[in-house]
Amino acid sequence: MIQPQTHLNVADNSGARELMCIRILGASNHRYAHIGDVIVAVIKEAVPNMPLERSEVVRAVIVRTCKELKRDNGMIIRYDDNAAVVIDQEGNPKGTRVFGAIARELRQLNFAKIVSLAPEVL
């Protein structure tokens, strides 16, 4: 469960290392974001000499959460960290690589480009 002020790792090579959630997009009364939700975040830590810089406001999609994700078949998936992938206004990733495992639910949410870049889909 991601809420405003939550710090997340970045799971791509866009240049950001750590994000802080400042808003959850989609509905005005969402308190928590789950896997597949789009958030507005600020970059708290960035790699030097990259396009994205510290204190820049970006959009990101949640790809991993520590909170369990329960599937319809009864399977429960839990990750070790909270992570997101930085995206542009059209929903395409800003980076060219995605690190770590990605949930299968992103494919149904029209993030097929992120799923295709991921090394492992759970």
UniProtKB/Swiss-Prot annotation:
NCBIfam families: rplN_bact (TIGR01067). Pfam families: Ribosomal_L14. GO terms for molecular function: large ribosomal subunit rRNA binding; structural constituent of ribosome. InterPro entries: Ribosomal_uL14, Ribosomal_uL14_bac-type, Ribosomal_uL14_CS, Ribosomal_uL14_sf. Binds to 23S rRNA. It comes from Ceratophyllum demersum. One of its GO terms (cellular component) is cytosolic large ribosomal subunit. It comes from the Eukaryota. Part of the 50S ribosomal subunit. This is Large ribosomal subunit protein uL14c. GO terms for biological process: translation. It is found in: Plastid, Chloroplast.
